[in-house]
Amino acid sequence: MSKFENVSVAKKANVYFDGACVSHSIEFPDGTAKSVGVILPATLTFGTTAPEVMELVEGHCRVTLPGADAPVTFRGGESFEVPADSEFTIEVLETVHYVCHYG
């Protein structure tokens, strides 16, 4: 799916890491929340409160997931899961366009 229908979008962007990651929160009619955004080339560590599925729409990165000894490479069209109350490190090699699915 290349677009979401019938959603509410927060006008103000979520800006993290001095602008290296910018996203917008969206809410579906059933209350489901997601964020859509971009991460510019950088190495960043994110914390989670809820479980997340990071869907890469486009881009190229290496991700070190909780408990992993080495990073795993992901490209557009792939996704990875992150447990609640954890951290992951992402090394963006080519700007990543993503959808973050919560819960």
Swiss-Prot record:
CDD domains: cupin_PpnP-like (cd20296). One of its GO terms (molecular function) is guanosine phosphorylase activity. GO terms for cellular component: cytosol. Its EC number is 2.4.2.1, 2.4.2.2. The keyword Transferase applies. Keywords: Glycosyltransferase, Transferase. Catalyzes the phosphorolysis of diverse nucleosides, yielding D-ribose 1-phosphate and the respective free bases. Can use uridine, adenosine, guanosine, cytidine, thymidine, inosine and xanthosine as substrates. Also catalyzes the reverse reactions. Belongs to the nucleoside phosphorylase PpnP family. This is Pyrimidine/purine nucleoside phosphorylase. It comes from Nocardia farcinica (strain IFM 10152). The gene is ppnP.
